[in-house]
Design a protein with these regions (language model features):
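Long amphipathic alpha-helical coiled-coil/heptad-repeat bundle
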Residues: 2-153
């Protein structure tokens, strides 16, 4: 864990944090499964004008299907996943055009589209209040941080 968190309470070990919140590391079979877009997902991906944005959309959708989270990454960090998407979905292309940094606004726009595709929406004030109430009730049973974390996650 980094020094900036040295004074904080430790609930999970670094490996546990990575397992829960880290970028997925897929096997070849998992790549086939998670990067196989539905017709609707493929249509949404293909609406992007550049190959880079199409590949980014399929990657983000696949990672979201796996972990129900979004991640910040560059193509060179997920090279094997990029190659898989190119081979499976855009075979005449190669990764030469995928060198530029991914724009934040593009990433966020795609994430909003993915959330809509899967029927997710933002948490409203009533739902946040319900979570706070559940946390308060849970703390009455046990104030152990790991217990609270497990119940609320």
């Amino acid at each position: 864990m980094t020094d900036r968190y040295a004074g904080r309470l430790t609930i999970l070990e670094d490996q546990e944090i990575d397992e829960l919140y880290g970028l997925p590391r897929f096997t070849p079979d998992e790549r086939v499964h998670f990067f196989a877009p539905s017709l609707e997902e493929r249509d949404a991906a293909d609406r992007h004008h550049t190959l880079a944005n199409r590949v980014l959309f399929i990657l983000q959708a696949g990672y979201f299907k796996a972990k129900k989270m979004f991640f910040s990454f560059e193509f060179d960090e997920v090279r094997e996943d990029v190659w898989h998407v190119l081979r499976q979905h855009y075979p005449p292309h190669h990764d030469d055009g995928l060198r530029a940094p991914i724009l934040k606004q593009t990433r966020h726009a795609q994430q909003r589209k993915i959330l809509t595709l899967y029927g997710y929406r933002a948490c409203d004030a009533a739902e946040r209040a319900s979570l706070v109430e559940k946390a308060e009730q849970t703390a009455r049973i046990s104030a152990k941080p790991i217990y609270l974390f497990q119940i609320l996650v």
